[in-house]
Amino acid sequence: LKLLAHISVSQAKKAGSDVVKQDKDPKLGNLVYPLMQAIDEILLDADIELGGLDQRKIFALSRDHIEQLGHEKCAYVMNELLPSMSKPGAKMSSSDLYGKIEFLDSKELIQEKLKKAYCVEKEVKDNPCMDLARLIVYPLGHTILECKEYSDLEKAWVEGSIYAGQLKEALAN
């Protein structure tokens, strides 16, 4: 509760604006969410916190107030968010079974999810299969369909020499 004495309603709203739904009369939980994340940092005695780019304002709130409570700042590492596998332009959601791939999903479930994934041929923008290749597969040192670099895959995709079914199957394997 000590943290509550240091943070205003407008600061809490701003910190959560990219993560929780904001409206004129927000639910208390929407305002408390960023504070809970900051408190987790304290209770876990975290040296580093990993999150998506949408967590940036929450991390800034923690950074700005954590020392006032006698705790050391931690390092924040942010990465791009993977989009929903089932809807263009949306982020992954825990409520959409086929919209996300989880670490503990079986190979069979991953294959099933990728078969159903939104994937417009020759399109790179808002294409979750291409984002998965760019953000996960290639940075981990893997290749897809003999394309050594992501740029090679993108070029082949845009030219139409790779089809959606081929890409999805390669991602699943």
Summary of predicted features, one role per range:
Residues 38, 44, 56-173:
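Conserved nucleotide- and phosphate/pyrophosphate-binding catalytic cores
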